Curated annotation (Swiss-Prot):
Gene name linked to the record: rsm25
Biased composition (Polar residues): 230-244
Subunit composition and interactions: Component of the mitochondrial small ribosomal subunit.
Main location: mitochondrion
Disulfide bonds: none
GO molecular function: structural constituent of ribosome
Organism this protein belongs to: Aspergillus terreus (strain NIH 2624 / FGSC A1156)
UniProt name for this protein: Small ribosomal subunit protein mS23
Any one of the GO CC terms: mitochondrial small ribosomal subunit
Localization of this protein: Mitochondrion
């Protein structure tokens, strides 16, 4: 075991000693700051605290007339860590993280929808009431399903995770179907009044795919010709197809008849 190096902890005392001895003309600007906020004197580094995951549930307890709020604690599994990762800070985890992971695993295309991340005051979540899925001023997305499922788990008595997921998902599908119908009806009404729309995203994608296919077909033909020419340079030129498949003329080649 080597000795402790306390040079960094005594940097202020060193600066004051050098000023008193006349080695420096004036003190550095950080001397007063380090005097007000000194560095830590603890030489032993403790491991980060392992936080517990607390869940709120409403359950009907035996002997109770009304459902009561119960806080469930889930102990984290302690995994052996490497020495280099022993003092890393603990990851911050919430209950809705797992709910969000399951929803987007079942609905991966929801991540492709555009999202609005700008908030008016930064506290828009305080005005949301997740007793219903659709919120005023918020676009319907996967996060709405996650928050709705979490509200059901925290407020409905004896609610299970799968049942809350089915309820929130059913409401989400119904609202999405309603949005699609409204969008289709609005487009039909606009076309009836003379509006014209350009190609859809699907049509644009198909056109780009066709162009790419035609470009690839031309490239494939050129590559095939290059390969044939390269093979012919090593094996010799092949006979034309007309000479190879020329039929034998029976009239020119007559067998003499015997007398």
């Amino acid at each position: 075991m080597g000795k402790y190096n306390l040079t960094a902890l005594r940097v202020r005392q060193t600066a004051l000693s050098q000023k008193a001895a006349g080695k420096i003309k004036r003190l550095p600007q950080w001397v007063d700051v380090i005097g007000d906020i000194p560095p830590a004197q603890v030489l032993v580094r403790n491991q980060p605290q392992q936080h517990q995951l607390v869940r709120q549930r409403v359950k009907t307890l035996p002997g109770a007339s009304k459902p009561q709020v119960v806080f469930e604690t889930e102990e984290k599994r302690v995994k052996p860590k490497k020495a280099s990762r022993m003092f890393q800070p603990v990851q911050i985890k919430f209950e809705e993280d797992q709910l969000r992971k399951e929803f987007f695993r079942d609905h991966p295309w929801e991540l492709a929808r555009p999202r609005v991340l700008v908030e008016t005051s930064g506290k828009d979540y305080e005005r949301y009431d997740w007793s219903r899925l659709q919120q005023p001023g918020k676009r319907l997305d996967g996060e709405s399903v996650v928050q709705r499922q979490l509200w059901l788990l925290n407020n409905v008595p004896d609610m299970t995770k799968s049942a809350a997921y089915d309820i929130a998902r059913r409401e989400f599908y119904r609202l999405r179907l309603q949005e699609d119908i409204e969008r289709r009806v609005a487009a039909e009404e606009a076309e009836a009044t003379g509006a014209t729309f350009g190609p859809t995203r699907l049509e644009i994608g198909m056109e780009l795919e066709n162009q790419e296919y035609e470009r690839w077909k031309q490239w494939a033909k050129m590559e095939a010709q290059i390969q044939e020419q390269r093979a012919a340079s090593f094996t010799g030129s092949a006979l034309p197809s007309s000479e190879e498949s020329a039929p034998v003329d029976e009239e020119t080649e007559k067998v003499p008849q015997q007398v």
